[in-house]
Design a protein with these regions (language model features):
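ABC-family P-loop ATPase nucleotide-binding domains
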Residues: 1, 191-248
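Conserved beta-strand-loop-alpha-helix hinge in the C-terminal portion
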Residues: 55-87
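Conserved structural motif at the start of ABC-family nucleotide-binding domains
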Residues: 109, 123-126
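The feature captures the beta-strand-to-loop junction immediately N-terminal to the Walker
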Residues: 140-142
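ABC ATPase NBD Q-loop/coupling interface
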Residues: 165-181
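Hydrophobic anchor residue at the start of the ABC signature
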Residues: 259
Length: 282
């Protein structure tokens, strides 16, 4: 049984369920299990051996306990280096290349008694939600709770939004605005976008596509815009991947490219749906 990052995207209850199933299966002498994992905490107790893979190099096989001990010893050394890097990163972020101060409204999002149904299934029922300028929100809930559906209303990706009482950036939906007039204010990344983004362009062009909210790049960026794309790629530690084609990158590298894409236009509203999905501990 081979599973590649099986815990990604699962809520706490489902993770525990999968862990229990794998634990029971591991007791079968006739079954061998190989898990490909990015997070140290995802290594189950029933795993007997760990093979570290770093920078496309396979390390020496180690018993699980020995690997965890060695990792924690190295982690203490990494923490000091990471603290220095974090301080440098914070200084760079403080010097953003530009800052968007052209806010369209103090009321960024307002949903009034919003309900979403698919057939007989109700996803959202009479939801009220207001996001004001300067606020930072976290949506928390189990898989299937309706978080992504809620975000699709804000991102103008749900056709049912036209039948709902929704105001975005001070303007009521369905009063003549286009989807693109809404999207130009929003930076967005999600697992669904990741799966759908199949353009095999250089990574920096994927980042640049965020300037125009397009899947693919159809308008040549100005030199100053390309500089901003490079700046954000450096911030996310992927500057060296700028000319690598997107589909040849690892899933984690692709996610970092799409995160840079979400930030690149200095959006008025930044929506990150499961932003750590598929990223390693670093």
């Amino acid at each position: 049984l081979i599973m590649d990052n099986p815990f990604i995207g699962l809520d706490a209850v489902t993770r525990e369920l999968l862990y229990t199933v794998l634990e029971k299966l591991a007791q079968l002498a006739s079954l061998q299990i190989v898990l490909v994992l990015s997070m140290l905490d995802d290594i189950p107790s029933f795993i007997t051996h760990v093979v570290p893979v770093d920078n496309k190099t396979v390390g020496e096989k180690m018993p699980r306990a020995a690997y965890l001990q060695a990792f924690r010893e190295q982690d203490a050394l990494r923490a000091e280096a990471d603290a220095a890097s974090l301080g440098e990163l914070q200084q760079r972020i403080a010097g953003l290349p530009y800052e968007n101060t052209n806010f369209t409204s103090d009321e960024v999002v307002r949903l009034n008694k919003v309900s979403i149904r698919y057939g007989d299934r109700t996803i959202l029922k009479e939801l009220d939600w207001t996001v004001m300028r300067g606020q930072k929100w976290a949506l928390s809930g189990e898989n299937g709770a309706g978080k992504s559906t809620l975000l699709s209303l804000v991102c103008a990706d749900n056709p049912q939004s036209y039948a709902c009482d929704i105001r975005l950036f001070g303007r009521k939906r369905g009063t003549g605005e286009s989807i693109w007039e809404i999207k130009k204010h929003i930076g967005y990344v999600s697992p669904e976008m990741h799966r759908a983004y199949l353009k095999n362009l250089p990574a920096i062009e994927i980042v640049a596509s965020g300037l125009h909210d397009s899947i693919g790049l159809y308008k040549k960026p100005r030199p100053d815009q390309m500089s901003i794309c490079e700046w954000w790629m450096d911030i996310f530690g992927i500057g060296h991947l700028a000319q690598q084609t997107f589909l040849k990158l690892s899933s984690g590298e692709q996610r970092l490219v799409l995160l840079a894409r979400a930030f690149v236009k200095d959006p008025e509203l930044l929506i990150l749906d499961e932003p750590l999905h598929g990223l390693d501990m670093t």
